[in-house]
From Swiss-Prot:
Superkingdom to which the source organism belongs: Eukaryota
GO cellular component: endosome membrane; plasma membrane
Pfam family, one: MFS_1
Protein name (Swiss-Prot/TrEMBL): Sphingosine-1-phosphate transporter SPNS2
Cited CDD domains: MFS_spinster_like
Source taxonomy: Eukaryota, Metazoa, Chordata, Craniata, Vertebrata
Family matches, as PROSITE patterns: MFS
Segments traversing the membrane: 102-122, 130-150, 163-183, 190-210, 222-242, 276-296, 320-340, 354-374, 378-398, 422-442, 463-483
GO biological process: regulation of humoral immune response; regulation of T cell migration; sensory perception of sound; sphingosine-1-phosphate receptor signaling pathway
Family in the record: Belongs to the major facilitator superfamily. Spinster (TC 2.A.1.49) family.
Catalytic activities: sphing-4-enine 1-phosphate(in) = sphing-4-enine 1-phosphate(out); sphinganine 1-phosphate(in) = sphinganine 1-phosphate(out)
Amino acid sequence: MCLESDGVGTVSNSQGCIPGAEERGLETLPGRMNPTSLDVKAVELESSSSKPDKAYNWKRASVAAAGILSVGNVLNYLDRYTVAGVLLDIQQHFEVKDSGAGLLQTVFICSFMVAAPIFGYLGDRFNRKVILSSGIFFWSAITFSSSFIPKKYFWLLVLSRGLVGIGEASYSTIAPTIIGDLFTKNTRTLMLSVFYFAIPLGSGLGYITGSSVKQVAGDWRWALRVSPVLGVITGTLLLIFVPTAKRGHAEQLKGSSWIRDMRGLIKNRSYVFSSLATSTVSFATGALGMWIPLYLYRAQVVQKSVEPCNIPPCSTKDSLIFGAITCLTGFLGVIIGAGATKWCRRKTQRADPLVCAVGMLGSAIFICLVFVAAKSSIIAAYICIFAGETLLFSNWAITADMLMYVVIPTRRATAVALQSFTSHLLGDAGSPYLIGFISDLIQQSTTKSSLWEFLSLGYALMLCPFVVVLGGMFFLATALFFLEDREKAEKLEPCSDPFTVGNCSDSEEASIL
């Protein structure tokens, strides 16, 4: 060939050469090209054709990761509420009163909320899936060990629940932020709905697993040996299959100090009010989840439909029914909450906090009716529990999604940790013990009888619906500032798909599924 390149991709004839067919074959509309530039074009074309494959593989990996993270969340709550499923047996075995039994959950939550901000700080700065798996392995080992504690060492069981709380804090704090970075917009809402459905599902399975395993094995200790085995398996899968997701647009955002992050979150009014609302949800779910099965058992003793249990193993019927109701209402609540929010977004941009507020206020009505119905009809009480829990659970995924909307990516783990801390501090850290303490206080002022054991616990639990109404007010306050805070965060909100350039469209998100 008789061609020369000038070094920038244009080709000219050498002196004395006559253009031939080969040269004419390389002509293009804008001019001529040399073989080198053709190779570059071919490489670029090959790269662009492989880009959709990489994007598809990334999306599949993201969906799989969200599934594994959701399974891990199920196990966290299964382990947490296994104790509640065998609470009556624990009371009989260690010979503790209502306040002592409530202390198990209170110590767990206290250690959980203290550890949450620490893991939030670590989650914004270090490898998140390593922290998650380490936390799972830790609480699995502690839970398994606690099943061998002798009768005279109740304080060791209390201490072990505190250590389990530290391990589970790592998961609940960091896992939602990984999902928040893997998905955007409606897809993120869907994936967070699946993740937070794990809360009622795991809670219900905790009651069912605890009571069923105890019934089969004839010993409540075996109930504490199921979740650790599953935890080790899940922790291993998490290490292998969950990708190391980028923290939103963290590589292009300037890092900030922890103090600056905290100041930014405290000034975020939507975040503050939604965190206070979440605290009321935690208060109610912590108290009701701990005491409702025992309350309904005492109601049946008063109605003389069951005999009092003085020596374990005791009846597991109420724990099984309550666990099944919790699983079903959690599923319905998450679906109803996500569906109602999606529909209401067509009407108003403040749909998220408004749907939560309506759910809370409606839930308070049915929770009140539980204590009225339980005096005469257990079936009616279960119906009210079903309706109240469905409405109460409808806001979990929505609240998490609101946080992702109003908080910038580099602060999300810290935001989740701080929200977890405040919700537990003001919520279920004290509510199980507080309800037990009030119940004991009322019993001390009356004659000891099955009737007053039932009534005292019911009077104490009546605190819950009033707290739930307060939560509805906080969600209404969130609606006032939601749009302004979301707009501020969206200025720094990136597309979480590393293979997409520019903004993510809803059609692109839909292709993930």
